[in-house]
């Protein structure tokens, strides 16, 4: 039974791993948490943690993982499950997969370095096209290089989330001059320059893949309740993922990659409703906990499916219509502090949200820490 395995969450202190910890805890499993320093000790405050280690970076966390838990499989005959929720963490672990595969059951694509291969934005866009998804025109450029045959405006992105300045490498440029100016601020040596269009919305799918990508559950889909030009929206509407053509394409991609783990797929919704594939995040996403609220706890279902060798027939649950999920301090900052709504209206919507990413009546200490650090987290 999967619950007989030690479960370890190694991630930056954030509400993302808090969702993993709560998903496991609500299923009766108290994980070990290797907490990499973040803005505030949010996830480590959860009552569901059995033991917490504090480290400064992924390298220190990896060394601790090996020294403290690297012998568990040899001593007990049962490999621990290892959960990831940060791009740099999964990228680092993927480059050490040969050292991990006999000791842990972790997110992977069958061989060392293969997850990183498809964290490369160009590679994953090409695979998406192969499997029939729409993709915006793009070029791979070295920093300072002007793309040929690409119409403006364009958007710049680091070629991989493990390289460069992540969000600080994202610039919208309306001309060659603006692109050259943006290069002065971009950290990544290799840049994806992509056609930019005004979006109607975004479409994020949360799921898991197991048994070399043969078992895939696309559990929920989220769209944003309001759009921000340069930031994700912290208020979303959650439904079942019911787009069959997209489902078929994504199942084909995940099987070809051979991915085993929890993931998120991001699409841009154009003004005419066209879905343009953006990327797959090969780790637990911030929005994953909404699937737990929909009775589909992805970390639990992934571990269970990996243990059993098959996905149970009732893994997918029907959502009765839709529900709202909220990143509380960020939504407050974006709407109340800017005067879009007042505190009274915000409190009404806060209470109506079925999923809070910080608040839980059953696990209150992270919420207390959140409130103490409200401005810092917003």
Label each PLM-derived region with a short phrase.
Residues 260-272:
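A short glycine-rich, hydrophobically flanked beta-strand micro-motif that places a catalytic Asp/Glu
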